[in-house]
Amino acid sequence: LKKVNVSLRPIVSNINLPTVIKTAVLPGDTMESIFVATQVGEIFYIRNRIARLFLDIRQRIIELGTNGGYDERGLLGLAFHPNFYYNGLFYLHYSKAGTQGQGALSGSFHPNPCEPETLSLRWVNRNTQYDHIDTVEEWILQPSGQSQRRRTLLNLRRPFLNHNGVNNLNFSPETGRLVLTTGDGGSGYDPFNLSQNMMEIAGKIIEIDVNTDILINNLPAVTRFNELPEAVQRTLTVIVKGTRNIPGIAFQRYNNQYIKYVGNVGQDLVESVFSFTYYKPIPVTEIISASTQNRSLNEDGLVNLGWRGWEGDLPTPIINPCLSNPSLVEETIAYYNEAISVATKRILPLTCYYHMDPRPDKFSGTALTGIQPYMGSEIPDLTGCIVFIDFVRRGSTPARGVLAYTKVRTECKLNDYSIIEPNYNFGTQSAYYVSLGANLTQSRLYLGVYGSSNVTDFNQGTVFEIV
């Protein structure tokens, strides 16, 4: 794959950290507007390079940056109903104000194969030992132009502050359902192995039938599917497990089907992009029924990304400096038994890139923060390709994110990828690549850049169009 050169055209600047970039046609309007959600809780819509406030829910968002400025909570998801133009419905995912807890573990977690008890921890006392509560809500844009919350779809109790997913609400053009992409709940190495446990909500991609109009007041905050009211259980199906942290799901029309793209943010070594076409959703009611009857669940057709046994294309490693030479590192398999157990159940990544990569035409990355297919024609070298971004190139000073791309999978092997070089001068300012969005036809791509890794360093965001 060859290196591709692009330009970046600024659309809006001096905003807070952009977590979601999408387009939609407002009711009564004739053209798409660009919508940008910020982590702190604002949603703007942009037309003719003028940003107007669509919604401000900053008072509803948990206090961010209390750990030094970096945070993975906040307003993380925004999706517009397929019939938004007619019904005004849209959906939000955010971390709720006033729900700060103490966390599920007092310290950091590191698995150690020589200490088997570290490989089988359980999340106990969940009602008190959690970090925060995330909510998924349905809102409606009223004819007056004001938006109002209609109902809560889910309240999720999260064990740690990180790995909540980002850009984590998207509608499936195949099923018309709302797709929630959740991370494994955080810390590191998935301490409680939530992502492989089918009863756990964490670490899954879930489809929600929003057309079943269920209104339940005071919906409980839950961690497992069987804690949900039965009426809510009936609206949910699981399509993917084994996620670690995930920047949304994207759909690419290909012949008469859709290819789905999802990414797993890596632990210490591997960032992965996955693609799949076929899947068989498993109703949550079936998961609960199998558990209640103590029978094994038929997971045929369920997509498994392999985490925590696998980090992309490698068994999840623990990286330590060599005792004899601290400038070198050794990689130890963290969860050997889990890796061989999941090996035949997982799908293989479409492409991977690494935190340490000496190859001259590659880069050493940090965290995958967005994936979008590009179906436009203005950048012909990228037409039909899958574009992805990394938060920050390792060792770059000042900090610079990375744009890259790969192609649709045609062979049963790991795809190569190549770097996209943006012709833009950020000067001495840091440029962390935090979000990647597209318009409705995927003919335009939008890049969210932030001047700091800390959400509480306010108003350092720019959204660009990639041209």
Regions flagged by a language model, labelled:
Residues 10-41, 365-375:
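Beta-strand-rich domains and repeat architectures in extracellular enzymes and scaffolds
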Residues 1, 30-58, 143, 400, ...:
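Beta-propeller domains
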Residues 1-17, 146-151, 232-234, 420-422:
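A short helix->beta-strand "capping" segment at the edge of beta-propeller domains
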Residues 103-170:
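Asp-box/WD-like beta-propeller blade repeats and closely related beta-sheet repeat scaffolds
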Residues 65-68, 73-75, 85, 97-98, ...:
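Beta-propeller domain segments
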Residues 50-80:
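Blade-loop segments of beta-propeller domains
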Residues 56-59, 153-158, 421-426:
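Short loop/turn motifs that cap or connect beta-strands within the blades
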